[in-house]
């Protein structure tokens, strides 16, 4: 056996159906699509969720919830990221200059992840309990 002598098993490859080529073929005239109706038309497919005119399930169920827009103006800052900030007093402006937050951010919260290597004063930012303890352990302080 060689690569150039390989052939598919008998019955494996079937020729494609040629439809609409006369009544003798068995697939003439309507080409196996039946008479009229959506599925007989060209481009005729039933849209997902369509239930024949009955009110579809996704419209029968109630709406719920909403997308909170506060996340668009809030940021989470890791404790280890504070090492990148040059300033001794860390506030929103200092975070912006250090390129840790974007210009549309109005509030930020510092959480405990990594370690702080220098003493800093955090001003006007929300701080978790663990992060506050770590900042104070590094010799810094948290101001409201």
UniProtKB/Swiss-Prot annotation:
What this chain does, per the entry, is described as:
Binds to the 23S rRNA.
Protein name according to UniProt = Large ribosomal subunit protein uL15
Q: Which Pfam families match?
A: Ribosomal_L27A
InterPro entries given in the database record:
Ribosomal_uL15 (IPR030878), Ribosomal_uL15/eL18 (IPR021131), Ribosomal_uL15/eL18_sf (IPR036227), Ribosomal_uL15_bac-type (IPR005749)
Output one GO BP term. Answer: translation
- Would you say which domain of life the source belongs to? Bacteria
The UniProt regions of compositional bias labelled Gly residues, in chain numbering, are 21-31
Q: Which SUPFAM superfamilies match?
A: Ribosomal proteins L15p and L18e
Query: Oligomeric state and partners?
Result: Part of the 50S ribosomal subunit.
| Start and end residues of each stretch annotated as Disordered | 1-54
Choose one Gene Ontology CC annotation of this protein and give it: cytosolic large ribosomal subunit
Query: Can you tell me which family this protein belongs to?
Result: Belongs to the universal ribosomal protein uL15 family.
The answer to whether keyword Ribonucleoprotein applies is yes
Q: What organism is this sequence from?
A: Teredinibacter turnerae (strain ATCC 39867 / T7901)
Q: Which residues form the signal peptide?
A: none
Record keywords, A-Z = Ribonucleoprotein, Ribosomal protein, RNA-binding, rRNA-binding
A GO molecular-function annotation: rRNA binding
Q: Which PANTHER family has this protein been placed in?
A: 50S RIBOSOMAL PROTEIN L15, LARGE RIBOSOMAL SUBUNIT PROTEIN UL15M
